[in-house]
Amino acid sequence: MPMTALADVFTKSVRTVALSTPIAVAGLMAAAVPVSAQSVLKVVPHADLRNIDPIWTTAYITRNHGYLVFDTLFALDENLEVQPQMAAGHEVSEDGLTYTITLRDELAFHDGSDVTAEDVVASIERWGARDGMGQKLMRVTESLEAKDEKTVVLTLSEPYGLVLQSLGKISSNVPFIMPKRLAETDPNTQIEEVIGSGPFRFVEDEWQPGNQVVYEKFEEYVPRDEPASYAAGGKVANVDRVEWRYIPDAATASQALLAGEVDYYEQPVVDLLPMIQSDPAINVETVDPLGTQGVIRFNFKYPPFDDKKARQAAMWAVQQADYMYSIIGDPQYFEEFCGAYFMCGGPYETDIGSEALREKDIEKAKALLEESGYDGREVLILDPTDIPVAHGQSLVTAQALRDIGMNVRLVAMDWATMTSRRAVRDAPEDGGWNIFPTWWLAADQLNPITNISVAASGDSAWFGWPENQKIEDLRNAFARETDAEKQKAIVEELQAELYDFVPYIPTGQYYQPTAFRDNVKGVLEAPVPFFWNISVE
Amino acid sequence: MYVYILRRLLATIPIMGLVAVFVFMLLHLSPGDPAVIIAGDFANEEQVDKIREALGLNDPLHVQFGRWLIDLLQGDMGESIYSGMPVTELIGQRVEPTLMLTLCTMVIAISLAIPLGVIAAWKVGTWIDRAVMTLAVFGFSVPVFVIGYLLILGGSRTLGWFPVQGYTSIFESIPGFLSHITLPALTLGAVYMALIARMTRATMLEVLNEDYVRTAYAKGLATRKVLVKHALKNAMVPISTTIGLGVALLIGGVVVTESVFAIPGLGRLTVDAVLRTDYPVIQGVILVFSFTYVLLNLLIDLTYVLFDPRIRY
């Protein structure tokens, strides 16, 4: 029997079973009616949506969910300039201390209530309690008040150059605007309801953690007139439903895209791209033009990396190409070399001081290590084997350090365990660590304030807890400076100090491709996957 | 017999109690702090501590255990640390796919493996026997995910008969259900089928050498009758034990199969929860799994009566 005939027999027998079963027929009819009338974008997201509160967690998946449901006061455009989004406009007083922000008309929440200045104030305050940049803004904020229904007044205690950059922050935590009743939730407790004023509505009934998340077009949303550009401009929902279907297995997700079961695969594995690209109906594009930065972080509390010379030795012992070939492989998706701590292609790109990273010099590294007084003690590198990007960085670092004579032990674990272990401040032999690998999206690394891996405020700094007053002074000077050219000069001075101090090794800049079928039109180029502007044919 | 069943059911209580204590201790003593994971990269120690406090993780272990146990006795398994959804609701969402996958797998596996095992024993030493045993070795040795990928490649991509992934509830659409469940059930069934076929063959071989089988043949009974009515019935006790024990194997395979075919079942829920140290969810699913396993063992013990009238409870 030919295969098609066999398939027919199968289909027919299946149909017979179905038609003889009233429940199935009723089910089929019920399912057919709404779906046929709707346009649906089926997406395989990079992770499962576990938390619905984008202020409570910094997880990128929750941030992406946030952008569908919530709106922001200001937003970053593709020129990396901050534009008004929910704000109609703003005025700054002559002394630069008072910002008066007016809200657009026709802003409404998904529960039907209007967006008011009070909602904005409560939302900014909650975000300011959690987010690093928000906390900095709150420190210089004298008052934040709702002057009337549509006007918010922010008064500063001292000049601050990053007010709009903070309120228009594009990555986690994004200052999303929620109704006051939700924004009054303790910042350390998750909100219990998802009500935003964004272009899509969260369909709570259809949310199945570990499986699917569904968003429906919010008909009352009024987009801005400007064309969409990064997070700014008109957020026009061109599909009725966006369905996130979490498929944990990369091979299965690729096959589902090839079979047309899904339309958009956010982060396909580079190894499987040749298979996906073999189908001409699938586009593979680097949607995020800014990319991602690999990071090798030291623990500054314990030898040997409490000594600057040991960190410099490590930097001379490695080169970015080794990392990139190990974790990405295809040179089409990474920069040959990027010496900028604040990303290549960003507004603060410079390669000042990056010689150690550009060239590998084992002899120099050995000499520096000796100068540091390294006594042969064991160096613990945390190795999250379930995340290829992190695992590859650990392996490359371990080999490079062994090459210069360090006694290295890789400690294999899963990512969740690593995120707990890196917070441990005890000595490496007592459950602590010396080195851990991670990565940051460029959107987080673009300037000295959002790039928390350069912060050097000691115990209150990011894991590893480096302390360097000069770096902190330069970061504060950058935040206070309102002149863009002067900010650039500060960054150059800062980067020279960073290469001397080595808070971490930037292991390279790489780009994550996204794959989507050719029935998907209007995918925006942006550091965050946005789902407005997209239509499905 | 009813007294026996009641006694066995009562015996599950201390067993479940032990499982509960063991699971709780194991989870809380293993590394991984959900508060740190939730707090993310930007949080300071004070914030992490506040989250820990909000989740009740700062209390001494026995207090946490007591709280969990009291809630559990009232039918409340707590809430997921991450999604905030009740564990009972999460498990409820996931029971059907896993139950259906396991049932379909058992139906396919048992209905294929027992006849294959019987035929292999009947035709022992011939090419039929060797072919069945080769298949069994293949099913047993090839990892579940490889079989899954091969079936996706063949059944979905090349022939286009079945969808690559996902699940449709049987209550929503029977054709949808059947098309979604076939490949996963075959995948998961491979190892199970191999196990049952080998066991059936081995026990049948033993039984076929018994005197009463020879007598049956001597009486002039048809081969089919001898094999099915006389030999197989007596071979069923060890076979049903294998079927029961094999369910443990299935539970392990379910996790992989559900991941490969993106089926939102209990296996995936367990893996996701373990990777994030979502304590209440892990505790909940392990309790459900062990309870099912204990019940299943009881069920298997009861089926012995059907096959061997000498057994009395």
Model-derived segments and spans:
Chain A
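Periplasmic-binding protein-like
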Residues: 305-346, 392-393, 498-506
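N-terminal lobe/hinge region of extracytoplasmic solute-binding protein
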Residues: 44-94, 125, 195, 506
